[in-house]
UniProtKB/Swiss-Prot annotation:
The chain crosses the membrane at residues 13-33, 38-58, 69-89, 93-113, 121-141, 152-172, 370-390, 407-427, 431-451, 459-479, 482-502. It comes from Escherichia coli O7:K1 (strain IAI39 / ExPEC). GO terms for molecular function: transmembrane transporter activity. Pfam families: FUSC (PF04632). Induction: Positively coregulated with aaeA and aaeX by AaeR. This is p-hydroxybenzoic acid efflux pump subunit AaeB. GO terms for biological process: carboxylic acid transport. NCBIfam families: PRK10631.1. Belongs to the aromatic acid exporter ArAE (TC 2.A.85) family. It is a multi-pass membrane protein. GO terms for cellular component: plasma membrane. The gene is aaeB.
Length: 655
């Protein structure tokens, strides 16, 4: 496909984006808004953002959800801006500095919350800054400006949603159905690999791929939930399927690890059974029926606990899968499965990374303020806004530097493109609303195609071009003002890029160590006799941390294996029949406190000291288990966990 070619699958969204822009433009001028540009810009960003992220037309509900986040972020930013102005209107410089800190604070929060919701906080940060900068000449008009800005943004969002509904957005349901079938086959094939106990690297690749696919399925569930309320039943089932899929991965990998020390546990009966290849979900269904008969014949005691647990989870997966595909009423059996354990929310391991993002945003905004005050440039305010926009939105993404480069390319491309519209197209079409709409529709159509290709600079070019062309009411054409705005955008992006380069993010190793210590803490916390604590479902949170570890350290197999071993230890200890008495319960609390100290320690010396204390406590705990005559189902996992912690002590404590 050539660089300027247009694929058929890209046309529908390009028309959708053009329609959203035209609707926002028409409504903005029809209601005599002072700056319809904000409505047009909002419609373009809300519609194009999900398409750029997806690399094609977004699924149904994505644009709606992004629009709601933008409304929430705008309202939070407007309220914060009003509070800052009312409190500090007599000290303009202090007011701007507080706004810079507010933008950094919002970036800090956006780095800690779920990535789907981070957009609202990033927007809240720079919206307050835009309000404070814009009202500098006339501060008494602040409430009016805030109301107008909210109105224009809501109009833009409504137009984007209307365009999305008008061009029948594609549903993700069929993709979910296909993935459920394919994932079950992949789970069975992973168990086959683990029972064969072949090449470790092949097994590592297989379970790593399944972790990614399960995480992707969870993202599809979020999209399906946003799409329509009629998928509420499917959404409940998919949430339970996520835990079941992770359980299948855990049991398969434990089967592999058990054979490292006790290969005789997997009998020839099961080895021969799992030799049969499977290609489709129907093949898996037949094999599971046969496997349940084999287990009924051999007896639960003669069946390895990992295989028994795997079959139970796969059977429940199958039952819920059929319910998702048909979207029928939830029956009593399914309801029993869905009434599972409450999921545990784990504390973010990226607190240091979030603090780096705070300083990047705050310092870049302060640098923009100093540049503005020092030069006295009329478009210094525009540069400041772009600094806040780039840093607020880039920081939450995996590669902020590339996002900043995208904005630089986009603002550079917007200069000639905006010049064409400012000097030629808009002056010749402003007398006719039809011609004006057609001219902007053409811009939206072609940039909509490039956005879907994820062309570097395409998203920035779309937003920057709309921002600098004259879409005010009434239209005024001042070339100096246009040039200042265009150059201000470029300078702002360059300054933001400079700060991102200078303020290095060296938090990766610290985040990795915190993640590994959180796995240790989870394994230790599983040693409890508290009934409510044992019913807590840690599995989704643990695999979410594992997925983050895989993204932070691609290809680092020893880290992945250590994390997976800790997850397996957690699951095994969670189900272990630990003797119930006050002596062990008190010691469980002591070990949990020590594990928490390991995570929160700020220096290597403290961390090593607490980790050494944890190892000593585990030795004492093993002695206590012998005194209280704990069964092998308890003593063996604790012994394995202690051995693992001794082996990887330096990796878990040293920077």
């Amino acid at each position: 496909m050539g660089i300027f070619s247009i694929a058929n699958q890209h046309i529908r969204f390009a028309v959708k984006l053009a329609t959203a822009i035209v609707l926002a433009l028409f409504v903005g001028f029809h209601f005599q808004l002072e700056t319809p540009r904000w409505a047009v810009l909002t419609a373009a960003i809300v519609a194009a953002g999900p398409a750029f992220a997806a690399g094609g037309e977004p699924y149904s509900g994505a644009i709606r959800y992004r629009g709601f986040l933008r409304i929430i972020g705008t309202f939070i930013g407007c309220i914060a801006g009003l509070v800052i102005i009312i409190a500090m209107i007599r000290a303009p410089l202090l007011m701007i500095l507080v706004c810079c800190i507010w933008a950094g604070f919002c970036t800090w929060i956006s780095s800690l919350v779920r990535i789907e919701n981070s957009y609202a906080w990033g927007l809240a940060g720079y919206t307050a800054l835009i309000i404070v900068i814009t009202i500098q000449p006339e501060p008494l008009l602040t409430p009016q400006f805030a109301v107008e800005r909210c109105s224009e943004i809501v109009i833009g969002i409504v137009c984007a949603i209307m365009a999305d509904l008008l061009f029948s957005p594609r549903s993700i349901k069929q993709e979910v159905d296909r993935e459920l079938e394919s994932l079950l086959v992949a789970q069975y094939q992973l168990m086959q690999l683990c029972i064969k106990h072949g090449d470790g690297e092949v097994v590592d690749k297989a379970w790593g791929d399944l972790v990614r696919r399960t995480t992707a399925l969870q993202g599809m569930r979020s999209n399906l939930n946003m799409e329509s309320s009629r998928w509420a039943r499917a959404n409940r089932r998919l949430k339970a399927i996520n835990t079941l899929s992770l359980t299948l991965i855990t049991q398969s990998c434990e089967t592999y690890l058990i054979q490292n020390t006790r290969p005789e546990l997997i009998t020839d009966t099961f080895r021969e059974f799992f030799d049969t290849p499977v290609e489709t979900a129907q093949d898996v269904h037949k094999q599971l029926k046969r496997l349940r008969r084999v287990i009924a014949w051999t007896g639960e005691r003669e069946t390895p606990v990992t295989i028994y647990s795997w079959v139970a989870a796969a059977t429940r997966y199958q039952l819920l899968k059929r319910g998702v595909i048909s979207n029928t009423k939830i029956n009593a059996t399914e309801e029993e499965i869905l009434q599972g354990e409450p999921e545990v929310k784990v504390e973010s391991a990226e607190r240091h990374h979030a603090m780096v993002n705070f300083w990047r945003t705050t310092l870049s905004c302060i640098l923009g303020t100093l540049f503005w005050l020092w030069t006295g440039w009329t478009s210094g305010s525009g540069a400041m806004v772009m600094i806040a926009v780039v840093t607020s939105l880039a920081m939450r993404l995996p590669n902020p530097r590339m996002v900043a480069i995208d904005f630089i390319y986009g603002t550079l491309a917007a200069l000639p493109l905006g010049l064409l519209y400012f000097l030629v197209i808009i002056p010749n079409t402003q007398q006719s609303m039809l011609l004006l709409c057609i001219s902007l529709a053409v811009l939206g159509f072609f940039l909509g195609i490039e956005v879907q290709k994820r062309r570097l600079g395409s998203m920035g070019a779309l937003a920057s071009t709309i921002n600098i062309i004259v879409l005010d009411n009434p239209m005024t054409f001042h070339f100096n003002q246009f040039l200042d705005s265009a150059l201000g955008q470029i300078v702002g992006c360059v300054l933001a890029f400079t700060v991102i380069l200078l303020v290095r993010d060296k938090s990766r190793d610290r985040t990795g160590r915190v993640l590994l210590n959180q796995f240790v803490s989870a394994a230790v916390s599983a040693m409890t006799t508290n009934v409510a604590r044992r019913k807590e479902n840690h599995l989704p949170a643990l695999y979410q941390q594992l997925f983050l570890l895989m993204n932070k350290f691609p290809g680092d197999l020893p880290k992945f294996r250590l994390a997976l071993t800790m997850i397996i230890a957690h699951q095994r200890l969670r189900d272990a029949p630990i003797p119930v008495n006050e002596d062990l319960s008190a010691f469980h609390r002591q070990m949990r406190r020590t594990a928490d100290h390991v995570i929160s320690a700020r220096s290597d010396d403290k961390r090593r000291r607490y980790f050494g204390q944890l190892l000593e406590e585990l030795e004492i705990y093993q002695e206590k288990l012998r005194i209280w005559q704990a069964p092998p189902q308890v003593t063996e996992p604790v012994h394995r966990l202690t051995g693992m912690l001794h082996k990887y002590q330096h990796a878990l404590t040293d920077s």
